[in-house]
Regions:
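Flexible, glycine-rich terminal cap/loop adjacent to redox cofactors
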Residues: 147, 163-267
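Rossmann-like dinucleotide-binding cores of NAD(P)H-dependent redox enzymes
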Residues: 3-63, 67, 127-135, 143-177
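Short, surface-exposed charged micro-motifs
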Residues: 54, 96, 110, 209-211
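Hydrophobic alpha-helical segments, especially N-terminal targeting/anchoring helices
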Residues: 17, 65, 99, 107, ...
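FAD-site-proximal beta/loop scaffold in flavoenzymes
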Residues: 71-147
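A short alpha-helix-loop-beta-strand transition element characteristic
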Residues: 98-101, 148-157, 184-188
């Protein structure tokens, strides 16, 4: 999704083939729908539920053949169908290091493998594959081994961004996860055109969503699609981790004119 936005911004006609009915599996459903709608407005084409059977190189580029019998001719193909831990050719099998079915290194809560002298962390363990998480895991392990400091990395409420165009920022539970975990979820969301887009004539809109446990008033999820979504959600991630309630958000005075203030004043209960 990120490279689709980059290439489109450089003037390339972009078509996204997606095996599922939607892109960005695991993200909040509203976020997935809103992003695709905005990207379509920009001129990016989506082909959901499409499986590529083969890619044929021709004089003018490539022809994509789908299992449904469709063909699409293009200048270039970026083939990105997922990723697996890059643990091949490390000699792990010679050392007896245990791997799971996707070749991720199996570790315990202290990042120790089944071989006592070998530790592993970050993407090769296939847990939360984000750079800041890798940094946190590395610092934890160094402190535990060499500074005798206790503690563990907390994998809940890790903020995440997708630098698509428009970008995504998210922290906490999706609506589906929240409804599975709690019986009383209130949903607040807003869809608006930021002031700078109104003045510039841009049609790009921004979407924000907040999930609240009704019985405790605790905010358990915040999601956004729009300019600087990652920058905005990073700040709110602190509030989520601190256990902020909706009342705290409601009583916080926002900065005007900003998009972020809509998380305080502009949400509609649905």
């Amino acid at each position: 999704m990120e490279f689709a936005g980059i290439m489109h911004g450089l003037g390339v006609y972009v078509t996204i083939f997606e095996r599922d009915d939607k892109v960005l599996r695991g993200f909040d459903e509203d976020i997935r729908d809103f992003l695709v709608a905005e990207m379509i407005k920009k001129g990016i084409k989506f082909m959901p539920n499409t499986h590529v059977d083969r890619i044929e190189q021709i004089d003018a580029g490539f022809t994509m053949h789908t299992t449904a019998g469709e063909t699409v001719t293009t200048d270039l193909v970026m083939y990105a169908t997922g990723c697996v831990p890059n643990t091949k050719n490390l000699g792990l099998e010679n050392l007896g290091v245990a791997l799971d079915k996707v070749s991720a290194i199996i570790v315990n809560k202290d990042y120790k493998t089944n071989v006592p002298s070998i530790y592993a962390l970050s993407d090769v363990t296939n847990r939360v594959n984000l750079t800041p998480v890798a940094t946190a895991e590395g610092m934890f392990l160094v402190n535990k081994l060499y500074a005798n400091k206790a503690g563990n990395v907390d994998y809940e409420n890790i903020p995440t961004a997708v630098f698509s165009q428009p970008s995504i920022g998210t922290v906490g539970l999706t609506e589906a996860q929240a409804r599975e975990k709690f019986s009383d979820i209130d949903v607040y969301k807003t869809d608006f055109k930021p002031m700078k887009n109104t003045l510039s004539g841009s049609s790009e809109r921004t979407f924000m969503k907040m999930l609240v446990v009704r019985s405790t008033d605790k905010v358990v999820g915040m999601h956004m699609v729009g300019p600087e979504a990652g920058e905005i959600i990073q700040g709110f991630a602190v509030a989520i981790r601190a256990g902020a309630t909706k009342a705290i958000f409601d009583n916080t005075i926002g900065i005007h004119p900003t998009a972020a203030e809509e998380f305080e004043i502009g949400r509609a209960h649905v």
